[in-house]
């Protein structure tokens, strides 16, 4: 038993009581062509898709950086250490961008480049977003948008040429090169591909010229709600109060037919540029993204952490799995263990199961057969150290301190 527990301890990730609410993975980064592509983040000779995803994570979670998704359809997919719980009546996801309000216009917006938000719950717990798990956040422009939209970008013979696009509505145009940005606009780690095709939802144009034809002043209007890079990150001048306009309510999710979906939570978020539009000398609309954050947190700044007392509603989970997960009967195979800051490990069982606590020497410190329903293992009275908590075959390594 001791050898088995030592081996198990080596395999289990360490769970400490402070878990960051910020995304900790970039699963894929696939921008469409654009004026900031290969710059934000910087592509260097030899960088492949994996290297660029790693750079995207570094840019997004570093200080003062963001990534560009390029023209319509370009996207980034991120994951989290903890599921973002869908809390009724609350906005659950905060997405930082680089939108700002124009000081010279009364129009709501200025530099708003809205990105469509997709969300997914990890139904099969495989750690990656499978195709059938994605749901769109239906923002304020959902009914005014073109759905099942598709754009293909054609790689030109030279990196100095504009890049042609064609959509499935019979339209075509160009991602135009502009004097301020002279690098290649085609993602260089995808240089072996002659065409890039994206599918999704095309939002309405949001560009307004508040100047004249000879002296244009372009304002990119903000939509009411439900998009990334649509509102400034903060609602106060000191940058202390997060702007609710930059937040997403998971309850805005819809399926492919536009029907509302009640998700228990979100493990993955995908954001893609939602407006296919060129803005004169400003170039194409290109959504920019910084951090994606779980709003259900405690503390501030570097001390901010996920509020582990907020857990998934098991009834909502059961109904979601029954409808979308192909689950006919529920058991403990998808059990999740939650650890809060007091040292309480909580879970919900669909059938009775054994709960145990071990130290790193393999000694069993606690063992109890737990009934169906909500259950808890309390580590608050234990000495500081590392423990293995095992429930129904699921094990989490917890640092008590």
Task: Locate each region found by the language model.
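Predominantly extracellular/luminal cell-surface or secreted proteins
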Residues: 118-122, 358-360
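A domain-level signal for the mature, folded cores of soluble proteins
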Residues: 19-115, 133-323
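Bacterial Sec-dependent N-terminal signal peptides
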Residues: 1-19, 376-377
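Acidic carboxylate motifs that coordinate Ca2+ or other divalent cations, activating on Asp/Glu
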Residues: 126
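Short amphipathic beta-strand/extended segments with alternating polar/hydrophobic composition
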Residues: 131-141, 369, 397-401
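C-terminal outer-membrane/trafficking sorting elements
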Residues: 326-401
């Amino acid at each position: 038993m001791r050898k088995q527990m030592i081996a198990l301890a080596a395999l289990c990730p360490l769970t400490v009581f402070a878990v960051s609410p910020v995304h900790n993975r970039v699963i894929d980064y696939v921008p469409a062509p654009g004026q900031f592509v290969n710059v934000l983040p910087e592509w260097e000779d030899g960088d492949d898709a994996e290297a660029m995803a790693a750079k995207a994570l570094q840019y997004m979670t570093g200080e003062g950086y963001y990534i560009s998704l390029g023209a319509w359809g370009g996207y980034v997919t991120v994951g989290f250490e903890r599921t973002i719980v869908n809390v009724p009546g609350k906005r659950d996801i905060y997405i930082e961008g680089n939108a700002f309000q124009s000081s010279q216009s009364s129009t709501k917006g200025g530099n708003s480049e809205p990105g469509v938000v997709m969300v997914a719950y990890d139904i099969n717990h495989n750690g990656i977003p499978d195709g059938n798990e994605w749901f769109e956040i239906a923002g304020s422009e959902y009914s005014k948008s073109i759905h099942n939209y598709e754009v293909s970008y054609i790689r030109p013979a030279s990196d100095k040429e504009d890049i042609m696009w064609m959509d499935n509505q019979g339209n075509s145009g160009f991602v135009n090169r502009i004097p301020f940005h002279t690098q290649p606009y085609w993602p260089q780690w995808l240089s072996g591909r002659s065409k890039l095709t994206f599918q999704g939802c095309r939002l309405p144009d949001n560009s307004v010229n508040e100047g004249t034809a000879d002296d244009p002043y372009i304002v990119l209007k903000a939509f009411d709600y439900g998009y990334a890079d649509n509102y400034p990150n903060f609602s106060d001048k000191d940058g202390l109060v997060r702007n609710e306009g930059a937040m997403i309510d998971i309850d805005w999710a819809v399926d492919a037919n536009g029907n509302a979906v009640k998700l228990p939570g979100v493990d993955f978020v995908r954001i893609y540029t939602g407006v296919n539009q060129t803005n004169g000398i400003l170039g194409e609309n290109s959504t920019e993204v910084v951090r994606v954050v779980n709003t259900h947190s405690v503390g501030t700044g570097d001390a901010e952490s996920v509020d582990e007392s907020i857990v998934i509603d098991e009834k909502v989970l059961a109904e979601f799995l029954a409808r979308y997960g192909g689950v006919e009967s529920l058991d403990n195979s998808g059990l999740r263990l939650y650890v809060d800051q007091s040292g309480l490990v909580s879970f919900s069982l669909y059938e009775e199961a054994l709960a145990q606590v071990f130290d790193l020497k393999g000694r069993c410190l606690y063992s109890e057969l737990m009934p169906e329903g909500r259950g808890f293992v309390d580590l608050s009275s234990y000495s500081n150290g590392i423990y293995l908590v095992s429930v129904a075959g699921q094990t989490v390594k917890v640092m008590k301190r």
